[in-house]
């Protein structure tokens, strides 16, 4: 089973057992993950989603068979995952989740590795790559990120 990290349960909300999850996933991916009747994994146990909504920066989730705040208190501060069989990832989404597994190929055919994918604010991201033992920062946009091949786990980039 291949698990994808979704976020962390930070607190409860209300008395009906709703839990707050803080997650760094893109909204398009959250829409795939938090579908009603999907199952999420907490401590390697599956829980079925009864409802989902956004509230401020949180993902608010009700789980089946939990109708009271006291029933969900044991889940506090736990990490939430989803089995990858429940969602179909695009190449871009796969890269954002599994960037450390990707090999970098530059436009002049040099090879390297992705060290990090960092947010710099205002929804802007930078890819930190290492090519020939030299660290480079590459803007995460279509001008520099030429091709993502999720089957080969390769990303083709343009360096300046």
Per-segment meaning from a language model:
Residues 1-160:
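Short Lys/Arg-rich amphipathic alpha-helical segments
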């Amino acid at each position: 089973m291949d698990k994808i990290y979704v976020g962390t349960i930070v607190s409860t909300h209300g008395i009906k057992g709703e839990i707050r999850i803080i997650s760094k996933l893109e909204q398009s991916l959250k829409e795939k993950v938090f579908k009603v009747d999907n199952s999420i994994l907490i401590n390697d146990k599956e829980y079925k989603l009864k409802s989902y909504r956004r509230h401020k920066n949180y993902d608010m989730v009700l789980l089946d068979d939990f109708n009271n705040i006291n029933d969900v208190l044991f889940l506090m501060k736990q990490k939430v995952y989803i089995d990858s069989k429940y969602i179909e990832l695009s190449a871009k989404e796969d890269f954002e989740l599994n960037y450390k597994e990707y090999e970098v190929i530059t436009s002049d055919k040099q090879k390297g590795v992705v060290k990090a994918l960092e947010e710099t604010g205002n929804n802007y991201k930078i890819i930190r790559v290492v090519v020939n033992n030299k660290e480079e920062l590459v803007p995460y946009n279509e001008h520099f990120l030429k091709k993502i091949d999720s089957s080969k786990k390769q990303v083709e980039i343009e360096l300046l």
